[in-house]
């Protein structure tokens, strides 16, 4: 991935950080079995009163033979689900496919896709967060090692 010096610095140093009321989660900080579709983050001390979750950045590599219109991010502990035929199953972060071959878009204010959500019921006592990227329809996405995303979680401290 071609990065500017500033972009490279941000990519390497965003990592998992805890501020008084914000947790920055980078999918490259995986714990548990290595998988590019799934990852878990252990949070210590546990977070109480999570109120908002926001997708700050997504850079998703293209699996071979992919013709998916978008990918979905799921995190059950935060109520971030995947839309189903029966209707919505909670908040869904959508990573759309850009019109350029081999490129996934960043989120921006002009983007109609959801990238920030207030949690309906504040999540309490979070000590582990499990994230998963799925294809349209719910199958495993088959992400590559160059795929990652950064999520910001706000909570009452």
What are these model-derived regions, one by one?
Residues 1-157:
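The ATP-binding site of the protein kinase catalytic domain
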